[in-house]
Amino acid sequence: MKPDNQAGVKHKGAAKTARIPIKIVPLDEKLKKPEWIRAKLPNGQRFHEIKQILREQKLHTVCEEATCPNIGECFSKGTATFMIMGDICTRRCPFCDVGHGRPNPLDENEPRHLAESVAAMRLKYVVVTSVDRDDLRDGGAQHFADCINAVREMSPATQIETLVPDFRGRLDIAVDILTQTPPDVMNHNLETVPRLYKQARPGADYAHSLQLLKDYKAKNPNVRTKSGLMVGLGETDEEILEVMRDLRAHNVDMLTIGQYLQPSDGHLPVLRYVHPDVFKMFEEKAYEMGFVHAAVGAMVRSSYHADVQAHEAGV
């Protein structure tokens, strides 16, 4: 049996969140899911085709690793969000179901495997995300660039969206590297309001994440920038609106807001289910603030219908 701190050992659920600075306090009684929280069950031939291609190419998707509720619908439509640089994250965010631990070294063949999969799946739009890699000097920025180059070479008509980590401590070098091979959309999720960062995003910094989005836009004015938020962690509506204002002040073009759903009892509990009328209010406010596109609703995730979001934003 491998020691807990050995490279490649993945911790999930309570094993992952046991050492976060603010401990998870479970509710005496879980909130009942309202009737508007519904996802389609995984099914169909296309769903299984996608899974087979991913396994053959030894690729990971955030759809599977983060236990996304929309996996059935997306896979059945032939869309997937690829997760590069392994399936082990160096952070312990207690809202996220991706495993934590010491990651394995980067796979130098991954960009080629990714490009081959995109071609095999005949994808017109692809989202590429990653785990956090605080162990790498550039946070993995060059690996992102290599993946973009490989996909562009094999599928030149395919549009690419990157959903990047925060590259904390490596912002300037990461922005420089990612400017050399720009995607069509650059996404970095703020996830929650600044008051809840220490609890929900240990290791991250709200101002740093905003700066990453602003600096990238400054160097790549023709690339749409995008960010996403969850609701249900204990934030107020006004705090969400304030984050939206901050995003616009940092020149972010596109917005997603969705309902947080607890992946397991070892994760942060859901403290409220936001009513569809409130989501509608957020959407209306987003357009009033000047967002080019806003995807807002209970089942919205940052990569859900990402192609539709991008095309409606003029990409």
From Swiss-Prot:
[4Fe-4S] cluster 2 binds at residues 89, 93, 96. Binds 2 [4Fe-4S] clusters per subunit. One cluster is coordinated with 3 cysteines and an exchangeable S-adenosyl-L-methionine. It comes from the Bacteria. [4Fe-4S] cluster 1 binds at residues 63, 68, 74, 303. The keyword GTP-binding does not apply. Its EC number is 2.8.1.8. Residues 75-292 form the Radical SAM core domain. Pathway: Protein modification; protein lipoylation via endogenous pathway; protein N(6)-(lipoyl)lysine from octanoyl-[acyl-carrier-protein]: step 2/2. It catalyses: [[Fe-S] cluster scaffold protein carrying a second [4Fe-4S](2+) cluster] + N(6)-octanoyl-L-lysyl-[protein] + 2 oxidized [2Fe-2S]-[ferredoxin] + 2 S-adenosyl-L-methionine + 4 H(+) = [[Fe-S] cluster scaffold protein] + N(6)-[(R)-dihydrolipoyl]-L-lysyl-[protein] + 4 Fe(3+) + 2 hydrogen sulfide + 2 5'-deoxyadenosine + 2 L-methionine + 2 reduced [2Fe-2S]-[ferredoxin]. Pfam families: LIAS_N, Radical_SAM. This is Lipoyl synthase. It comes from Chromobacterium violaceum (strain ATCC 12472 / DSM 30191 / JCM 1249 / CCUG 213 / NBRC 12614 / NCIMB 9131 / NCTC 9757 / MK).
